[in-house]
């Protein structure tokens, strides 16, 4: 078979399927999405998978944690010998720079974690013997993914390491430090890691920069910024954790973050307020249009129904009302729930 394999948050398969269908149609490639709710992945079946993968950059996909090009689908695999059919399916393929054996991040997929781990250890030497895997990981070469959907059912796929998530299952394993004021700190940590390239992070998040955190309490996002030695104005009528204020980098203003505006332009504005997504998109656009910040990261809380439609509408609304040349990226992060995280930076 030919197509794209994309992982997603369990329950968001319809949104990812709609996104892939819309984006494929936009670039003129015919295909269809194959999925079931709670699978944790979507297969977009098409004849021009490599061409579609090249046109749909991983960082531009909103609901996809990972993007892979499918090589083969194997069903009815003998549990006593899974290696032979995989080697046969890979005959004629180029040498891969690494191997990841995975499973969907879903209720049905998680019990396959043990199989994935042990089978990877068995498959690596067989691939090397067949000349299909380098002796050591080579990140510049394509990466082979084996995704077990069941003990006898697997998808074989390939990733371009420069255009795919650099973490197994597309999930960055971030640790919540004891001093973090809230779990929401992981959202901003992941956003900086996922939405910005290493070069962009180095250039755009520097010590001494100034930022605003709208709706800051109890201070999770503010705390993440102070760890980068950024000066933060935290705007919220609620209290911040004492140790966040003790950094000496934080000014706490007891005000409504939705209506406050800075006296001078800032490098960053971040916002994780619980509010209607269109209202948030419009307010964030005002910040950019008025020049109150150069760059922003904000969350949009999605409705229970028509989430892809609402996502597309909110992003279009934001870009139209911002009236600036912007680079906009959005992602449903692993640490997001019924929401997406949006990055907008000056182009």
From Swiss-Prot:
<comment type="similarity">
    <text>Belongs to the class I-like SAM-binding methyltransferase superfamily. RNA methyltransferase RlmE family. RlmM subfamily.</text>
</comment>
<feature type="binding site">
    <location>
        <position position="272"/>
    </location>
    <ligand>
        <name>S-adenosyl-L-methionine</name>
    </ligand>
</feature>
<keyword id="KW-0963">Cytoplasm</keyword>
<dbReference type="Pfam" id="PF18125">
    <property type="entry name" value="RlmM_FDX"/>
</dbReference>
<dbReference type="InterPro" id="IPR048646">
    <property type="entry name" value="RlmM_THUMP-like"/>
</dbReference>
<comment type="function">
    <text>Catalyzes the 2'-O-methylation at nucleotide C2498 in 23S rRNA.</text>
</comment>
<feature type="binding site">
    <location>
        <position position="236"/>
    </location>
    <ligand>
        <name>S-adenosyl-L-methionine</name>
    </ligand>
</feature>
<dbReference type="InterPro" id="IPR040739">
    <property type="entry name" value="RlmM_FDX"/>
</dbReference>
<dbReference type="InterPro" id="IPR011224">
    <property type="entry name" value="rRNA_MeTrfase_M"/>
</dbReference>
<feature type="binding site">
    <location>
        <position position="184"/>
    </location>
    <ligand>
        <name>S-adenosyl-L-methionine</name>
    </ligand>
</feature>
<keyword id="KW-0949">S-adenosyl-L-methionine</keyword>
<feature type="binding site">
    <location>
        <position position="256"/>
    </location>
    <ligand>
        <name>S-adenosyl-L-methionine</name>
    </ligand>
</feature>
<dbReference type="GO" id="GO:0032259">
    <property type="term" value="P:methylation"/>
</dbReference>
<dbReference type="Pfam" id="PF21239">
    <property type="entry name" value="RLMM_N"/>
</dbReference>
<dbReference type="GO" id="GO:0006364">
    <property type="term" value="P:rRNA processing"/>
</dbReference>
<keyword id="KW-0698">rRNA processing</keyword>
<keyword id="KW-0489">Methyltransferase</keyword>
<dbReference type="GO" id="GO:0005737">
    <property type="term" value="C:cytoplasm"/>
</dbReference>
<dbReference type="GO" id="GO:0008757">
    <property type="term" value="F:S-adenosylmethionine-dependent methyltransferase activity"/>
</dbReference>
<keyword id="KW-0808">Transferase</keyword>
<feature type="active site" description="Proton acceptor">
    <location>
        <position position="301"/>
    </location>
</feature>
<dbReference type="Pfam" id="PF01728">
    <property type="entry name" value="FtsJ"/>
</dbReference>
<comment type="subunit">
    <text>Monomer.</text>
</comment>
<dbReference type="InterPro" id="IPR029063">
    <property type="entry name" value="SAM-dependent_MTases_sf"/>
</dbReference>
<dbReference type="InterPro" id="IPR002877">
    <property type="entry name" value="RNA_MeTrfase_FtsJ_dom"/>
</dbReference>
<protein>
    <recommendedName>
        <fullName>Ribosomal RNA large subunit methyltransferase M</fullName>
        <ecNumber>2.1.1.186</ecNumber>
    </recommendedName>
</protein>
<feature type="binding site">
    <location>
        <begin position="217"/>
        <end position="220"/>
    </location>
    <ligand>
        <name>S-adenosyl-L-methionine</name>
    </ligand>
</feature>
């Amino acid at each position: 078979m030919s197509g794209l394999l994309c992982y997603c948050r369990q329950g968001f398969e319809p949104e990812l399927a709609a996104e892939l269908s819309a984006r494929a149609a936009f670039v003129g490639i015919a295909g269809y999405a194959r999925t079931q709710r709670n699978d944790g992945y979507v297969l977009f079946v098409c004849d021009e998978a490599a061409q579609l993968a090249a046109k749909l950059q991983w960082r531009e996909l909103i609901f996809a944690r990972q993007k892979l090009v499918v090589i083969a689908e194997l069903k009815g695999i003998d549990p006593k010998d899974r290696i032979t059919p995989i080697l046969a399916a890979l005959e004629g393929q180029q040498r891969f720079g690494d191997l990841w054996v995975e499973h969907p991040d879903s209720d049905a997929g998680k019990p396959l974690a043990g199989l994935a781990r042990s089978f990877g250890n068995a498959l690596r030497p067989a691939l090397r013997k067949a000349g299909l895997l380098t002796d050591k990981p080579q990140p510049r070469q394509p990466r082979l993914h084996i995704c077990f959907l069941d003990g006898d059912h697997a998808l074989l796929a390939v990733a371009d390491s420069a255009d795919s998530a650099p973490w197994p299952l597309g999930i960055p394993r971030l640790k919540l430090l004891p001093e973090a004021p809230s779990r929401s700190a992981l959202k901003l940590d992941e956003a900086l890691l996922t939405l910005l390239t290493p070069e962009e992070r180095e250039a755009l998040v520097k010590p001494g920069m100034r930022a605003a955190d709208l709706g800051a309490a109890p201070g999770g996002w503010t705390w993440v910024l102070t760890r980068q030695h950024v000066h933060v104005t935290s705007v919220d009528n609620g209290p911040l954790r004492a140790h966040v204020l003790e950094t000496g980098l934080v000014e706490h203003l007891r005000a409504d973050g939705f209506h406050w505006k800075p006296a001078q332009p800032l490098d960053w504005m971040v916002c994780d307020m619980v509010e209607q997504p269109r209202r948030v998109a419009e307010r964030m656009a005002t910040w950019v249009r008025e020049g109150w910040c150069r760059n922003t990261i904000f969350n949009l809380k999605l409705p229970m129904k028509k989430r892809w439609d609402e996502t597309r509408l909110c992003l279009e609304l934001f870009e139209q009302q911002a009236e600036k040349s912007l680079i906009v990226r959005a992602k449903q992060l692993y640490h997001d729930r019924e929401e997406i995280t949006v990055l907008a930076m000056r182009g």
